[in-house]
Amino acid sequence: MKYIGAHVSAAGGLANAAIRAAEIDATAFALFTKNQRQWRAAPLTTQTIDEFKAACEKYHYTSAQILPHDSYLINLGHPVTEALEKSRDAFIDEMQRCEQLGLSLLNFHPGSHLMQISEEDCLARIAESINIALDKTQGVTAVIENTAGQGSNLGFKFEHLAAIIDGVEDKSRVGVCIDTCHAFAAGYDLRTPAECEKTFADFARIVGFKYLRGMHLNDAKSTFGSRVDRHHSLGEDNIGHDAFRWIMQDDRFDGIPLILETINPDIWAEEIAWLKAQQTEKAVA
């Protein structure tokens, strides 16, 4: 079964994220459990936790259908020790918040070397950051997102994801989230069914589908291989409809959150309905 949704706002309380997801007929959703542009947040109250869990139960969302995202400020591969420690502490806090909320996944961007250390050293720092966080938490899987490769961001090659996973001690609590816009901008073609087959054959060989714990379904304003991260609505730009139809018809993408981060929230309900319909359309050639 496909779990299809969007990254919804938690404004006014975390429980509102589940309510907003239900309003667009989503069977999955993503959210921030704190302000994503601030380092610190007040601890979760018992009331907030209880209300969130109650809303998820009311609208039939299990932890397998929810893909929280951490703060954009965190850089688990930071070259400077003091800044790295700050990011690690913030990431542990994000993992602990997920633990408190009964969530089992935390999606994050891997990190950036800032042109100060090698890619290899940065990837090793990211893996060690994950190890530290896993050691201090229980039940939450660290889900590494591929990136478009803007600036010095790592994670734009499948090999980067594989290297991080290789350095994580508890392989049962690490996974990946593939963002279609990021992959396309990083040079993984998705414009035709044949290109989708090739890209995900590479993914299967280098990373492995057993580590796929979520996806972000976004078309790309950015051009192929541009290393620029610019999302668009499904079928409206450089990737086109075929990739998303192909994903909907492949059972390797069952049972994980498939999350829209497309640019127009007003049409998320339409995009979700379209994605659901593709599961029973004539198979992509």
Curated annotation (Swiss-Prot):
Catalytic reaction equation(s): Endonucleolytic cleavage to 5'-phosphooligonucleotide end-products
Bound cofactor: record note: Binds 3 Zn(2+) ions.
Residue sites binding Zn(2+) 2 per the record: 145, 179, 216, 261
GO biological process, one term: base-excision repair
Cofactor: Zn(2+)
InterPro entries: AP_endonuc_2, AP_endonuc_F2_Zn_BS, Xyl_isomerase-like_sf, Xyl_isomerase-like_TIM-brl
Binding site for Zn(2+) 1: 69, 109, 145
Record keyword Cytoplasm present: no
Family matches, as PROSITE patterns: AP_NUCLEASE_F2_1, AP_NUCLEASE_F2_2, AP_NUCLEASE_F2_3, AP_NUCLEASE_F2_4
Binding site for Zn(2+) 3: 182, 229, 231
Alphabetically ordered keywords of this record: DNA damage, DNA repair, Endonuclease, Hydrolase, Metal-binding, Nuclease, Zinc
UniProt-recorded Gene Ontology molecular function terms: deoxyribonuclease IV (phage-T4-induced) activity; DNA binding; DNA-(apurinic or apyrimidinic site) endonuclease activity; phosphoric diester hydrolase activity; zinc ion binding
Superkingdom field: Bacteria
Protein EC: 3.1.21.2
Function recorded in the entry: Endonuclease IV plays a role in DNA repair. It cleaves phosphodiester bonds at apurinic or apyrimidinic (AP) sites, generating a 3'-hydroxyl group and a 5'-terminal sugar phosphate.
Protein family membership: Belongs to the AP endonuclease 2 family.
Protein name: Probable endonuclease 4
UniProt organism field: Shigella boydii serotype 18 (strain CDC 3083-94 / BS512)
